[in-house]
Design a protein with these regions (language model features):
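C-terminal His-loop and adjacent cap/lid subdomain of alpha/beta-hydrolase
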Residues: 1-304
Length: 304
């Protein structure tokens, strides 16, 4: 994603309501490349990813035919496969969800798009038009009230910034350092809506962690007290495991069903993982070899 916080943010041509300018990332149809862009949930909270698909006021934009865009649901910016969640300076455990299995399938899809003209699967991302892209407050997102989890609805805001007279969206020389926010000029930033467990509804949901969830995975985390606790915790998301039993859940006041309630026998978990993985494979969003790996890993898990 284009990270310089200046218009244009989206691939198709549009008019910016904040500046009145009309522009696009892609504007030379004869030579524009094929594009597959992915963003994690954290990119919505920290890097204004929603502006790829809507304008400054939240009005939905249409992506060009040569662009595909996918949300890697409920993932943080980067997670190391197999690494145990840890808190560091964050309040909650880090998010262990790794969406690499989807990236592998999309690389194959890009290769086919270029070599034989087979288009990739349709884009999958949250949209305001179907209620899956919303304001960051709790009422809008639907994030559950989980014991010992602070939800501030804090998002990295994006005011229009003045970089000095020699800098435009096309580049130039920054003469105003640090750049100054222009009063009364701000871009609306939206985030993915979540389900009753607190996991993103839209996008590509990893079968063994969201198709059959083991906890809540988010694209945001807060810093602990003593580490600027009012702020988001950098590029780290959150992992909030489900209680193992109904008794544990009831004792803590957790509204999310426990593992015991979700998966009375281990086969229930494996069946849900298998069904979810098969659906993605049919849509060419998972490779068969990764389906086998996911199912093998799920078989080895003790749930509940």
């Amino acid at each position: 994603m284009k990270r310089v916080a200046t218009f244009p943010f989206s691939y198709g041509e549009s008019t910016d309501p904040v500046t009145g300018r009309r522009d696009a990332i892609l504007k030379r149809p004869r030579t524009d490349p094929y594009v597959i862009q992915t963003d994690t949930s954290l990119e919505y909270w920290q890097f204004h990813a929603s502006l790829v698909t809507h304008d400054a006021l939240g009005n939905e934009l249409t992506l060009p035919d040569n662009v595909r865009y996918y949300l890697l649901s409920s993932a943080q910016h980067l997670a190391v496969a197999g690494a145990a969640p840890n808190r560091g300076m964050c309040e909650q455990l880090s998010n262990p969800l790794t969406p690499g299995v989807f990236l592998r399938a999309l690389i194959v899809a890009m290769d086919r798009w270029i070599t034989d003209g087979t288009p990739p699967p349709p884009s999958e991302y949250p949209r305001a038009s179907n209620g899956t892209l919303v304001a960051p407050d709790r009422t809008s997102t639907g994030f559950p009230s989980i014991p010992n989890v602070r939800y501030g609805g804090l998002v990295n805001r994006l005011p229009l910034r003045d970089y000095g007279p020699q800098f435009t969206s096309q580049g130039g020389i920054i003469t105003l350092v640090p750049p100054q926010a222009v009063p009364g000029k701000e871009y609306r930033v939206l985030v993915p809506k979540v389900d009753a467990d607190g996991n993103d509804v839209a996008g590509l949901r990893r079968p063994d962690e969201l198709g059959a969830p083991l906890g809540t995975y988010t694209g945001w985390n807060h810093r602990q007290a003593g580490f600027r606790s009012a702020d988001l915790c950098g590029l780290t998301g959150s992992y909030i495991p489900f209680a193992r039993t109904r008794a544990e859940r009831t004792a803590s006041g957790d509204p999310r069903p426990s593992l015991e309630e979700r998966y009375p026998i281990g086969k229930n978990y494996l069946d849900q993982v298998t069904q979810s993985a098969a659906g993605y494979a049919r849509r060419r969003l998972l490779l068969q070899e990764d389906v086998a790996r996911i199912e093998q890993a799920a078989t080895g898990r003790t749930v509940p």
